[in-house]
Amino acid sequence: MCRGLSFICPFVPSTAQGRDFPLKGKIGIYIDIIELLLALNSIALKIPFVKYHGAGNDFIMIDDREGTIGPLLTTEWIARACHRHFGIGADGMILVQEGEDEAGFFMKYFNSDGWTSSFCGNGGRCFAAFTEDLEIHGGAFEFLGTDGWHFSQRDRNNEISLSMTDVHTIDKLDDKNFVLDTGSPHLVLFTDQLENIEVKLKGREIRNSTPFKEKGINVNFVEILAPGEIKIRTYERGVEDETLACGTGVVASAIAAAFSTDTNNHSWLVHARGGDLHVDFKHEGDQHFTNVRLTGPAVESFRGEIDLLPTS
């Protein structure tokens, strides 16, 4: 895959055609400068991308190892690229960047609103698959996210298993509502009427309520089907809508289910709207959950190029 930017220049300044620089005379130089500025203004910067999804949670993946793309991106451009009618369409955008001080590779994540955000679990698994496609690694990989280091590995089912942050604090609001951080902040609300909930409406209401309005929170509506098995629907901040899956939300919901039911199940099957995911962990007692792993598909959808600047 091509790295960095490719350039398409619509024309060469007319005064430069058929002869060598420097041009003779000040007038010719001024004309050259003006035409060059006009040309630069209409240059289309082509950014290669690959679209991936993890259980329907989809991302625009960009190789920025050379560090030439990130500084050019604006919040508005990212939001438009993620827009499902005016852009490529995605829940977020992820850049592969070189870590600082030779610290390996960094996963730079943006929500679909164009703003940088906390860690994304499904995005992390897609990051692992994309970097494998770039031949950065051969299936086992360690990289840095906003919440620390993560280790990924492709398993025997060709799925990506990703280590997640340990959990040591669970805030029990009542018997059905729990708040915890699994790399991103989550509220887990248990219900036995999952399919009757208006997730976008109710999720937005909770996300913008007084305790959570300033920083926002992801809202997970969860139904326990059996010991070790749950069904989930998630409203994601930054996307400000229901998504087909949310990796950190899946992990938070499985841990909250284990904590609230006081079960010995350390392996959970989670049914998201976009597909099934698996969560494994070690329950050290009380609110302490370690060796947390999220496993599921990370699949390429398509690839192409997108203009950084309009050509008109």
Language model features with spans:
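A glycine-rich beta-to-alpha transition motif near the start of alpha/beta enzyme domains, typified by
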Residues: L36-R156, V188-S312
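Extended Gly/Ser/Thr-rich low-complexity repeat segments
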Residues: K172-F178, R303-L308
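Residue-identity detector for glycine
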Residues: G4, G18, G25-G28
